């Protein structure tokens, strides 16, 4: 349920709270989002207040420069004169006996445009036109970010450093933990064809890790180019109208990062096959930057390496999180199947 304070703010915006849209809609990421009229209402932990305020300023800048497919944030009526008018802190509206611990009595709430369109649930549903449209949209987003003030020289992307560390640990241990996790995973209700494919997938993942670890080490140690990016540009966060992009949602992972992450995350979740299949979208990405007098801050092969490394690490993580597969129809089963297919089709 929406907290009382959030309800009052929405009423002040003239929204009807009696509609069925107050039922939370669970996205592919697991986050609950309420649709009220033409707005999306989403909660965050109280501890994320300062970060949300920073993210909102960047998202507002993108929304002002890109009309239509970046959701605009709505200022809460009672906060119009505050430094962070788009971040509302509200106490949870729950019976006393059902209340959580004191440190989670409050949460942050944001209100933004509800964008139209549909998303692709599987990689097979994505069309070549959608792949190209997404790449062009990312190029537009990154061009705007490059034109913003740069972070201090010598800064590093912690996400890249962490991926490199995890990859090196897998190689040094000869993938021992994933193989042990596979034995325990056999007790979960996973389709037999998928379970039988995992040993072959692990062999392929190990070879990919061996092939990519030097390139990954170089990226982690030498690349210090960072600018604002979406941070989780996988296919579930893109909305489409036919082949065109109609929306990019969920900016909660936006940050100053190496920009190749966005393209790796997006195309890696939309294209199955070798790097050659990425060339047309890559050219569209480059064109969006060129239209603004800019060039990519990374090479296509670097983004592809990041995708391959991320796929290996995703497989290892999924094998170790057995709770994701306790339900026979868990979405994680489809995600595991997709990762296995990507690692085998190399």
Predicted regions mapped to residue ranges:
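A glycine-centered beta->alpha junction motif in the catalytic cores
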Residues: 105, 109-124, 187, 309-327
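Active-site acidic catalytic loop and adjacent metal/ATP-binding pocket
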Residues: 26-37, 41, 210-261
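Active-site activation/catalytic loop segments of kinase-like enzymes and analogous catalytic loops
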Residues: 259-293, 308-327
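A cross-family kinase active-site recognition segment
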Residues: 124-199, 226
């Amino acid at each position: 349920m929406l907290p009382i304070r959030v309800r009052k703010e929405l009423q002040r915006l003239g929204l009807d709270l009696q509609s069925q849209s107050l039922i939370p809609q669970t996205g592919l990421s697991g986050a609950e989002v309420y649709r009220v009229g033409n707005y999306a209402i989403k909660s965050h932990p109280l501890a994320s207040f300062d970060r949300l305020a920073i993210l909102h300023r960047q998202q507002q800048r993108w929304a002002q420069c890109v009309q239509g497919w970046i959701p605009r944030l709505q200022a809460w009526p009672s906060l119009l004169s505050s430094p962070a008018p788009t971040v509302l802190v509200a106490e949870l509206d729950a019976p006393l006996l059902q209340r959580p611990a004191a440190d989670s009595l409050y949460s942050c709430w944001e209100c933004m445009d509800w964008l139209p369109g549909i998303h692709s649930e599987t990689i097979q549903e994505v069309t070549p036109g959608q792949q190209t449209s997404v790449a062009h949209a990312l190029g537009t987003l990154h061009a705007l970010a490059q034109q913003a003030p740069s972070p201090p020289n010598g800064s590093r992307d912690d996400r890249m450093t962490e991926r490199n560390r995890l990859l090196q640990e897998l190689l040094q241990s000869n993938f021992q933990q994933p193989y042990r996790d596979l034995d325990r995973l056999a007790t979960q209700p996973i389709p037999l064809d998928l379970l039988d494919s995992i040993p072959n997938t692990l062999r392929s993942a190990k070879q990919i890790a061996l092939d990519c670890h030097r390139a990954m080490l170089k990226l982690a140690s030498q690349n210090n180019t960072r600018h604002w990016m979406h941070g989780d540009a996988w296919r579930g966060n893109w909305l489409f109208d036919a082949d065109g992009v109609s929306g990019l949602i969920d900016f909660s992972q936006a940050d100053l990062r190496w920009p190749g992450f966005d393209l790796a995350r997006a195309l890696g979740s939309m294209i199955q096959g070798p790097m050659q299949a990425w060339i047309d979208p890559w050219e569209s990405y480059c064109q969006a930057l060129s239209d603004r007098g800019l060039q990519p801050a990374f090479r296509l092969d670097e983004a592809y390496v990041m995708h391959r490394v991320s796929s290996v690490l995703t497989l290892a993580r999924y094998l170790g999180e057995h709770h994701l597969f306790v339900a026979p129809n868990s979405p994680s089963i489809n995600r595991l199947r997709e990762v296995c297919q990507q690692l085998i089709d190399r």
